[in-house]
Swiss-Prot record:
Native organism: Carboxydothermus hydrogenoformans (strain ATCC BAA-161 / DSM 6008 / Z-2901)
Gene: dxs
Family as reported in the entry's similarity comment: Belongs to the transketolase family. DXPS subfamily.
Subunit structure: Homodimer.
Protein name per UniProt: 1-deoxy-D-xylulose-5-phosphate synthase
InterPro entries assigned to the protein according to its UniProt record, in alphabetical order: Dxylulose-5-P_synthase, THDP-binding, Transketo_C/PFOR_II, Transketolase-like_Pyr-bd, Transketolase_BS, Transketolase_C, Transketolase_CS
Catalytic activity: D-glyceraldehyde 3-phosphate + pyruvate + H(+) = 1-deoxy-D-xylulose 5-phosphate + CO2
A Gene Ontology cellular-component term: cytosol
Binding positions (thiamine diphosphate): H74, G115, H116, S117, G147, A148, N175, Y286, E366
């Protein structure tokens, strides 16, 4: 940790620094962020890109009185360090340590909890409205990236904020990944006068004077407005924001602290909503991240000198899915693939490379992705929509109304289902079985390993209705891949026979359950272990047989217990009047914390050792 950073405990300490020290602070922050991220993993490139921006914001604004809201939160590392969490930052993303995202219960400087994209402007507007209703005085600032602006929610909020004309500042962090940078001397000149506080006041005074000219005054003003608007449409990149009712300032250099301090100070003088457009470089200050900002967006542990990962990457469920889809689409031209701004994260990068004309990245627009897929399915295509479980929640209405109500053959590849690890509660995919299971016409499949994933994808592509196929983040199990095979819908698979009780489950934990059951054999306890494979429809014939045994039944899943797979088993037994004792194991009715996947699974009793102990305890009581 550098000597200047050592002197910084809270944002007020930043205001005491000289301009040269502010730039040195930026360098020290980058070094500290790189060091910690190399040891803990994290969202490195986004945070490196906003170091100077973060310093400028905390120099100008008076947090926590002033509210600074970071959209998504990938870029909030410097913010955390500068707001009293400097020493704790070494615990970033570790179990019991600092979250990788802003959290209200972690610090008063985290004005709003985030993790999902495009929410900051809505939250900021809500705070501004609350401020004004209560007669309070403080600034509200939303910091949103150009990528997050592809989300429809952001534009809904911009539209409403522009209409209400409340005092609000939106900082658009343009890291050159989506919005093209405006160029030209005249553009720079127009930007300079737009950031001058004299411009707004002087323009109004000039118009008032011209209007007083007899006969031609009002006409001159109208002509001037048309000419001005014509130039702005051609040359000013903020025209969209102006039309929505915002004052636009920029673009400015997001790595020039002095310039940003000046512009943020000016932004505070406006009575209505303001957009400040800053240009930053994702990964700034670390060669490997600058060269490959997408690859260093989210990283595991890596060597600082080379940028190479500490652990060699293992084959993941995502990779198996992506490559299998490429194989299966080879002779099926009707298969198309859709992602919501996550081509690499969902494994669809392989599909995009092989079939670019059949690949669609819609941006951060999950609702649009699902309904677009529905339209494609109406016209004979076979859309595969690959979205993380936690983000699929955003398109719930579209899944129901546009896909399942019409029984359209859309395949939902639900990635990152279950516990995801260090990204924590905003990213755990623990609700999808519950919110998808209630929807009529939808078939739900859950593979326990990568071979079953391939078979289920094959089955889904051949099914005539909508299918959700959920699988976890991280390394696959390591089983041998066998030929593709059509699975009969709603059939389970018995993995082990036993006489003392039945374990039935789905997904990753079933592998641990099988090992736990095998361990119990050494103690004379014999369990049947069943892979349900389908959460909807269930294998009702097999459940009837299980119920007739009058032995304890234990369900296992990596989903919240409420409304999940175990609940489906309970409902069927209740409907059929089967009095078998059932115990449901899964995620408790709470938001799991962040940490390694194994740590979180252990917390909820879903590891091999914990399941072994739990099975033994349950059987001793029932």
């Amino acid at each position: 940790m550098g000597p200047i950073l050592e002197r910084i405990s809270l944002p007020e300490d930043i205001k005491k620094l000289k301009p040269s020290e502010l730039m040195a602070l930026a360098q020290e922050l980058r070094e500290y962020i790189i060091t910690v991220a190399s040891q803990n993993g994290g969202h490195l490139a986004p945070s490196l890109g906003v170091v100077e921006l973060t310093i400028a914001l905390h120099f100008v604004f008076e947090a926590p009185k002033d509210k600074i809201i970071w959209d998504v939160g990938h870029q909030a590392y410097a913010h955390k360090i500068l707001t009293g969490r400097k020493k704790q930052f070494k615990t970033l993303r570790t179990f019991g340590g600092l979250s990788g995202f802003p959290k209200r219960d972690e610090s008063p400087y985290d004005a709003f909890g985030v993790g999902h994209s495009s929410t900051s402007i809505s939250a900021a507007l809500g705070m501004a409205l609350a401020r004004d209703l209560k007669g309070e005085q403080y600034e509200v600032v939303a910091v949103i990236g150009d990528g997050a602006l592809t989300g429809g929610m952001a534009f809904e909020a911009l539209n409403h904020a522009g209409h209400l004309q409340k005092k609000l500042i939106v900082v658009v962090n343009d890291n050159e990944m989506s919005i093209a940078q405006n160029v030209g001397a005249l553009s720079a000149y127009l930007s300079r006068i737009r950031t001058d506080p004299k411009y707004s006041r002087g323009k109004d005074e000039l118009e008032a004077l011209i209007k007083k000219i007899p006969h031609i005054g009002p006409t001159m003003v109208k002509i001037g407005e048309r000419l001005k608007d014509s130039f702005k449409y051609l040359l000013v990149p903020g025209m969209l924001f102006e039309e929505l009712g915002f004052t636009y300032l920029g673009p400015i250099d997001g790595h020039n602290i002095k310039e940003m301090i000046e512009v943020f100070s000016r932004a505070k003088t406006f009575a209505g909503p303001v957009v400040v457009h800053v240009i930053t470089k994702k990964g700034k200050g670390y060669h490997w991240a600058e060269e490959n900002p997408d690859g260093f967006h989210g990283v595991g542990k890596f060597y600082i000198s080379t940028g190479e990962p500490v652990e060699a990457p293992r084959v993941s469920f995502t990779e198996v899915f992506g490559k299998a889809l490429v194989e299966l689409a080879q002779d099926r031209p009707e298969v198309v693939a859709i992602t919501a701004a996550m081509p690499t994260g969902t494994g669809l990068n392989y599909f995009a490379q092989n079939y670019p004309e059949r690949f669609y990245d819609v941006g951060i627009a999950e609702q649009h992705a699902v309904t677009m897929a529905a339209g494609m399915a109406c016209e004979g295509l076979k859309p595969v929509v690959a979205i993380y479980s936690t983000f699929l929640q955003r398109s719930f209405d579209q899944i129901i109304h546009d896909v399942c109500l019409q029984n359209l053959p859309v395949v939902f590849a639900v990635d990152r289902a279950g516990i995801v690890g260090e990204d924590g509660p905003t990213h755990h995919g623990i609700f999808d079985l519950s919110y998808l299971r209630m929807i009529p016409n939808l078939t739900i499949m859950v593979p326990r390993n990568e071979d079953m994933l391939r078979k289920m994808l094959f089955t889904a592509l051949n099914h005539s209705g909508p299918v959700a196929l959920r699988y976890p983040r991280g390394a696959a199990v390591g089983v041998e891949l066998t030929p593709y095979e059509q699975l009969p819908i709603g059939t389970a698979e018995i993995l082990k026979e036993g006489s003392d009780g039945v374990v039935i489950g789905v997904g990753r934990p079933l592998n641990y359950a099988l090992k736990a059951a095998q361990k119990l054999e050494n103690e004379g306890i014999s369990l049947t272990v069943i892979d349900a494979r389908f959460v909807k429809p269930l294998d009702y014939k097999l459940l009837e047989e299980v119920g007739s045994l009058h032995k304890p039944v234990i369900t296992v899943e990596e989903n919240v217990v409420a409304g999940g797979f175990g609940s489906a088993v309970n409902e069927y037994f209740s409907f059929r009047g089967i009095g078998t004792k059932v115990v449901n194991l899964g995620i408790a009715d709470e938001f799991p914390p962040h940490g390694k996947v194994e740590e979180i699974l252990n917390l909820y009793g879903l590891t091999e050792e914990k399941l072994y102990l739990k099975f033994r305890e349950i059987l001793s009581k029932l």
